[in-house]
């Protein structure tokens, strides 16, 4: 039984040793824990924070670029809208100018027509007045010539028989008849 007890003792010792190996010693555990804490602190302080800071900066840079792009896009849309508005206003003004010019041209044509018509009417009136004046002058001169001719004829016929008062009466009668 010695052999069995030895084997059992050996087995127990091996098991105990394996058990101790399974759980490290407290100083080794504390040293490992301290190394882990120092490593975590070192990694956090020298790598994680700078990387996080750079990522945050990059994220902010990207966001700023996106915001700037959106702002530029908005400004571009506003400028486009303003340009379209100005273009429409310019088209309206051009249309108004063209319409105004057409109206002015039509008014000028109408004024020239009216002026020409007035001038032609004035010329016609002057011509009619001139014709009337010439007719009156012709009638007056004709009467005078007829009266002169009648007087000469009457004098020749009645030279001896009619006195000058009677002659005037005849001339006045002839003048009076010719005026009618």
Swiss-Prot record:
Highest taxon above the source species: Bacteria
Membrane topology listed for this record: Single-pass membrane protein
A GO-annotated cellular component: plasma membrane
One Gene Ontology MF term: proton-transporting ATP synthase activity, rotational mechanism
Transmembrane segments: 26-46
Keywords for this protein: ATP synthesis, Cell membrane, CF(0), Hydrogen ion transport, Ion transport, Membrane, Transmembrane, Transmembrane helix, Transport
UniProt key word Lyase: no
Pfam family, one: ATP-synt_B
Record's keyword annotation contains Transmembrane: yes
Main localization, broad class: membrane
Localisation per UniProt entry: Cell membrane
Family of the protein in this entry: Belongs to the ATPase B chain family.
General function of this protein: F(1)F(0) ATP synthase produces ATP from ADP in the presence of a proton or sodium gradient. F-type ATPases consist of two structural domains, F(1) containing the extramembraneous catalytic core and F(0) containing the membrane proton channel, linked together by a central stalk and a peripheral stalk. During catalysis, ATP synthesis in the catalytic domain of F(1) is coupled via a rotary mechanism of the central stalk subunits to proton translocation. Component of the F(0) channel, it forms part of the peripheral stalk, linking F(1) to F(0).
Binding partners and assembly: F-type ATPases have 2 components, F(1) - the catalytic core - and F(0) - the membrane proton channel. F(1) has five subunits: alpha(3), beta(3), gamma(1), delta(1), epsilon(1). F(0) has three main subunits: a(1), b(2) and c(10-14). The alpha and beta chains form an alternating ring which encloses part of the gamma chain. F(1) is attached to F(0) by a central stalk formed by the gamma and epsilon chains, while a peripheral stalk is formed by the delta and b chains.
The name this protein goes by in its record: ATP synthase subunit b
Gene giving rise to this polypeptide: atpF
């Amino acid at each position: 039984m010695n052999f069995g007890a030895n084997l059992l003792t050996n087995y127990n010792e091996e098991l105990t040793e394996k058990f101790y190996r399974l759980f490290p010693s407290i100083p080794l555990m504390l040293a490992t824990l301290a190394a882990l804490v120092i490593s975590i602190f070192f990694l956090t302080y020298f790598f994680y924070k700078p990387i996080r800071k750079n990522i945050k900066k990059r994220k902010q840079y990207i966001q700023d670029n996106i915001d700037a792009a959106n702002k530029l896009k908005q400004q571009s849309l506003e400028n486009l809208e303003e340009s379209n508005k100005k273009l429409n206003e310019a088209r309206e003004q051009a249309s108004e100018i063209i319409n105004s010019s057409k109206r002015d041209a039509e008014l000028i044509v109408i004024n020239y027509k009216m002026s020409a018509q007035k001038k032609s009417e004035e010329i016609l009136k002057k011509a009619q007045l001139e014709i009337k004046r010439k007719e009156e002058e012709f009638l007056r001169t004709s009467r005078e010539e007829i009266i002169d001719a009648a007087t000469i004829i009457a004098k020749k016929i009645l030279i001896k028989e009619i006195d000058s008062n009677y002659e005037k009466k005849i001339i006045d009668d002839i003048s009076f008849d010719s005026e009618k």
